[in-house]
């Protein structure tokens, strides 16, 4: 660590004690319930002795919250916040304070999970619906998704969509030579393993003889040039190819939309709509398509449906496209997106409205025009007469001295050799423009030059069509109205600030307030990802510590922080394996073994790197079938690339033979990818790198406390053994190289760098001892829940000593035969008790997977278990004939205020039974705003952007 700090001596006031839910007295009572004499005995019964790490985890002593924040201040002081005029897809922006305080800093928003349970996610879903509406309106296209990871990833996903959907059946893709450089490198990474050829050139001439399935044009391009893309789009369409525009959202308030110009797909970043640059992220990217492509659109889509009363209700639509259902046939491996950032961007548009956005855009453009006029006066004519917010000039031999003078003014310019780029944004003042002129050698007055500036948007590219016409973008002009709107939406959702979220494989633990504080400090939030490294010294000191700690925790030798999600970490890890085999002359190794219980991202990721998936069966105990593994490893020995295995397994058990599994794969020349989704059961107790794994990703939004944000952001760094280290994802911004053994998987070299502060503080606060204790209590909590529920809902899988890991699968499938109850009924009934449901039907259809984490107290675990037991009693009443399943409170759940307020009540159970089930609170009850959502209706009547209000007024009444 960069600064030595003394450890905190008083364990009674330590952060670990507040992070971990059960008190010492609770732990003793829970151990008695699970029939273990001590936590140590329980760990010995849970983990195979062959994988236990020998030495205690050592990442330094735990710090107090005050000490940790002081340490972060010292790191922040090492970062230098210059004015960024670099551009290249990242812009300074102003997050309205009402949005910062009431969304970004509000646990009601940032601790929620992905809205798979729509009834308790209506506020978040409405915000995402606003985002989709905003994107559709600005791009002029029909359907948008609810965010992607970053612009580079969005471009790669659009390329893949074009390959699936175009009439042209070639394997070549055209890329405008003036796309953002980081986008081009991500495209190269995605294209190479799939055998797609990139043709990089000038759309004006190089498209003529090219046979391609699609083409990507930047609008405006990375130099700032604003060119009419219609001729290039027409050429692409003539070839049977799809046209993709990477478009700047703020520019689209003034210039013609991609839809008007004939584009099939639009992608880009919503970062400049109120989201800080954060040294690379997190930011919400977007993708919009014409209607014919909607079923091939990657990522999540929010649609409008109806609830059980016929009232409007939002839900995730067209989920059969996604990896958790389609696996290797999915449109993408996307799981985590950028929901929290998409919500911020949408609310930025709600806050400003169309008039406000246009005013911001006009101001930015006007100042850029003034800048250009001054540069001309100084002898530096912009390369293009048409632009929005960026100009590029040829500086020749003066380039280095201009850059140095700009840095003396605390300004960063973009540069490519002797060509200098100056990009303005909503934070740019007249003083900054004058400072930029000084860097170019001139003392000019903004007021004097302003009269010479001219509009630089050509008449044929001026926007004509209206946008953001829905009332939601007009009704919240005052901060009072905006504040109340945000509060209203937050109140509709159930997040960790209200109750435990026991989702298996999701690790919904505490996101402590202290961990979130540095996120908004300008020293972390305001850095452009491509500033000189010396200006980000504090960041790099933090990166070094994080990489060291993750290596100590995992047993690996090197770590890349670049992947922006767990799925992207999988992708990067498999690319490393692929690169390793190719470097050894074994590029023919393309078979990936995947257990049938694997998360859907695993086969989807394998497919994305050109591997062929071979499924390995599981035995009756939920473990990998060793006989089947041996047979398939032998059958594919010459072509075996890897196995992807989750540990502990997705069945919630530490498999006894994990070392044998690794040995079998290694014996046949393969590598072991160990999915780190369940690392929360291993930290301090076992290290994947010690028992045979070669590579893993670490879900920082699970094990290491980055909040889920309602569906993102997330981070998925990967750790590798030394032989794979040369094949970690590279990035030209870190070493200046344009070619790497494995190219970048994210647009920014360190992914969503700013949220790494959260995991970093968590580790500072816990220390090695605290992290280990958290793992032990996570396992104890899970075994406690299993012990309490087993007599009512049998636990499906245990190890040979009767233990589970950090999560368990309960099995109500027999109850469906005896009562007709479904897992959906149980999930919706839990809402009446104030709980989010456990994970449904994964990895075993018809079951529920529960993960309580270490952060939940015994009291909360008991409240959840009591609710589940009460639901079992309600099922028994159906079995005994008190009422049919259709007439039961289970099938009518969740119950809403509309139900309790009905003038008439004709149901077979009492009103109080439905609305206030046994053990639930009447004084602080959570009321979900809608009844059970009709999923079938939503997919058959797809609506993915705000309709005219009058269309739904009657239903709402």
Swiss-Prot record:
Q: Which GO terms describe its cellular component?
A: cytosol; glycine cleavage complex
InterPro entries per the record? Answer: GcvP, GDC-P_C, GDC-P_N, GDC_P, PyrdxlP-dep_Trfase, PyrdxlP-dep_Trfase_major, PyrdxlP-dep_Trfase_small
Q: Which GO terms describe its molecular function?
A: glycine binding; glycine dehydrogenase (decarboxylating) activity; pyridoxal phosphate binding
| PTM sites of type N6-(pyridoxal phosphate)lysine | 702
User: Which terms are listed as keywords in the entry?
Assistant: Oxidoreductase, Pyridoxal phosphate
Its EC number is 1.4.4.2
Q: Which SUPFAM superfamilies match?
A: PLP-dependent transferases
Oxidoreductase keyword on record? yes
Q: Which Pfam families match?
A: GcvP2_C (PF21478), GDC-P (PF02347)
Say which family it is in.
Belongs to the GcvP family.
- Quaternary structure, from the entry: The glycine cleavage system is composed of four proteins: P, T, L and H.
Its annotated function is as follows: The glycine cleavage system catalyzes the degradation of glycine. The P protein binds the alpha-amino group of glycine through its pyridoxal phosphate cofactor; CO(2) is released and the remaining methylamine moiety is then transferred to the lipoamide cofactor of the H protein.
The protein, known as: Glycine dehydrogenase (decarboxylating)
Annotated organism of origin: Bradyrhizobium sp. (strain ORS 278)
Taxonomic lineage from the root:
Bacteria, Pseudomonadati, Pseudomonadota, Alphaproteobacteria, Hyphomicrobiales
């Amino acid at each position: 660590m960069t600064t030595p700090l003394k450890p905190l001596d008083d364990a009674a006031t330590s952060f670990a004690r507040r992070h971990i839910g059960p008190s010492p007295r609770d732990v003793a009572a829970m151990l008695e319930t699970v029939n273990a004499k001590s936590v140590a005995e329980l760990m010995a019964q849970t983990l195979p002795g062959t994988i236990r790490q020998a030495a205690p985890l050592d990442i330094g002593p735990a710090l107090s919250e005050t000490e940790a924040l002081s340490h972060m201040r010292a790191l922040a002081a090492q970062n230098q916040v210059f004015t960024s005029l670099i551009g290249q897809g990242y812009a300074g922006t102003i997050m309205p304070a009402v949005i910062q305080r009431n969304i970004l800093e509000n646990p009601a928003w940032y601790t929620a999970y992905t809205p798979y349970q729509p009834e308790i996610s209506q506020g978040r879903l409405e915000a995402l619906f606003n985002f989709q509406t905003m994107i559709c309106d600005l791009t002029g296209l029909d359907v948008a998704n609810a965010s992607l990871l970053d612009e580079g990833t969005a471009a790669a996903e659009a390329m893949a969509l074009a390959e699936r959907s175009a009439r042209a059946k070639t394997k070549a893709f055209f890329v405008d030579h003036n796309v953002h450089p980081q986008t081009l490198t991500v495209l190269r990474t995605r294209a190479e393993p799939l055998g797609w050829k990139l043709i990089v050139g000038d759309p004006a001439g190089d498209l003529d003889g090219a046979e391609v399935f699609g083409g990507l044009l930047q609008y405006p391009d990375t130099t700032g040039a604003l060119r009419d893309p219609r001729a290039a789009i027409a050429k692409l369409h003539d070839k049977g190819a799809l046209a993709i525009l990477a478009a700047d959202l703020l520019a689209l308030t003034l210039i013609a939309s991609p839809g008007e110009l004939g584009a099939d797909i639009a992608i880009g970043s919503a970062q400049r709509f109120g989201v800080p640059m954060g040294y690379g992220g997190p930011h919400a990217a977007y993708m919009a398509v014409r209607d014919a492509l909607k079923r091939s659109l990657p990522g999540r889509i929010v649609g409008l449906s109806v609830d059980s009363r016929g009232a409007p209700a939002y839900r995730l639509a067209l989920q059969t496209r996604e990896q958790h259902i389609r696996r290797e046939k999915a449109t993408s491996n996307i799981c985590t997106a950028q929901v929290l950032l998409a919500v911020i961007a949408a609310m930025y548009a709600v806050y400003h409205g169309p008039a406000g956005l246009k005013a911001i855009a006009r101001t930015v453009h006007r100042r850029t025009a003034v800048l250009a006029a001054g540069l001309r006066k100084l002898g530096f004519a912009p390369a293009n007469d048409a632009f929005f917010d960026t100009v590029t000039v040829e500086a020749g031999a003066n380039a280095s001295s201009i850059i140095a003078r700009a840095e003396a003014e605390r300004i960063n310019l973009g540069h490519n050799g002797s060509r200098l780029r100056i990009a303005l944004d909503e934070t740019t003042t007249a003083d900054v423009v004058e400072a930029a002129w000084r860097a170019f050698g001139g003392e000019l007055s903004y007021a004097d030059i302003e009269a010479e500036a001219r509009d630089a948007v050509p008449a044929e590219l001026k926007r004509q069509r209206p946008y953001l016409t829905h009332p939601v973008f007009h009704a919240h002009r005052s901060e009072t109205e905006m504040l109340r709107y945000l509060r209203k939406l937050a109140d509709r959702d159930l997040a960790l600030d209200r109750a435990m979220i026991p989702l298996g494989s999701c690790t919904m633990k505490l996101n402590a307030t202290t961990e979130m504080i540095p996120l908004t400090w300008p020293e972390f939030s305001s850095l452009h990802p491509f500033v000189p490294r010396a200006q980000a010294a504090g960041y790099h000191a933090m990166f070094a510590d994080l990489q060291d700690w993750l290596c100590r925790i995992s047993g690996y030798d090197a770590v890349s922080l670049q992947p922006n999600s767990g799925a992207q970490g999988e992708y990067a890890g498999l690319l490393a394996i692929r690169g390793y085999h190719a470097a050894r002359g074994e590029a023919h190794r393309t078979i990936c073994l995947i257990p049938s219980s694997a998360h859907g991202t695993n086969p989807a990721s394998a497919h994305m790197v050109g591997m062929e998936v071979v499924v390995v069966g599981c035995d009756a105990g939920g473990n990998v079938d060793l006989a089947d593994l041996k047979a398939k490893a032998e059958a594919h020995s010459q072509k075996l690339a890897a196995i992807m295995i989750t540990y502990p397994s997705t069945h919630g058990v530490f498999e006894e033979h994990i070392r044998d599994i690794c040995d079998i794969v290694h014996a046949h020349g393969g590598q072991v990818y160990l999915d780190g989704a369940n690392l929360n059961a291993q930290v301090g107790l076992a290290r994947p790198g010690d028992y045979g794994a070669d590579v893993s990703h670490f879900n920082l939004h699970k094990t290491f406390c980055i909040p889920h944000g309602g569906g993102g952001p997330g981070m998925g760094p990967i750790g590798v053994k030394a032989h794979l280290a040369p094949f970690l994802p590279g990035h030209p911004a870190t070493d200046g190289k344009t070619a790497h053994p494995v190219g970048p998987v994210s647009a920014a070299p360190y992914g969503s760098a700013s949220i790494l502060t959260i995991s970093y503080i968590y580790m500072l606060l816990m220390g090695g001892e605290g992290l280990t204790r958290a793992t032990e209590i996570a396992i104890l909590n899970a075994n406690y829940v299993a012990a309490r529920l087993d007599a009512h809902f049998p636990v499906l899988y245990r190890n040979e000593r009767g233990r589970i890991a950090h999560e368990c699968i309960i099995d109500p499938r027999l109850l469906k035969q005896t009562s007709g109850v479904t897992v959906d009924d149980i999930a919706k009934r839990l809402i009446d008790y104030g709980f989010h449901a456990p994970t449904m039907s994964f990895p075993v259809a018809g079951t529920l997977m529960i993960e309580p984490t270490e952060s939940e107290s015994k009291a909360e675990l008991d409240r959840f278990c009591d609710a589940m037991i009460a639901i079992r009693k309600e099922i028994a009443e159906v079995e005994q004939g008190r009422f049919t399943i259709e007439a039961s409170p289970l099938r009518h759940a969740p119950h809403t205020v509309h139900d309790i307020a009905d003038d008439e009540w004709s149901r077979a159970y009492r009103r109080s039974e439905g609305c206030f089930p046994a053990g639930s609170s009447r004084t602080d009850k959570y009321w979900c705003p809608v009844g059970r959502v009709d999923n079938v209706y939503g997919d058959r009547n797809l609506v993915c952007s705000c309709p005219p209000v009058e269309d739904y007024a009657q239903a709402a009444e």
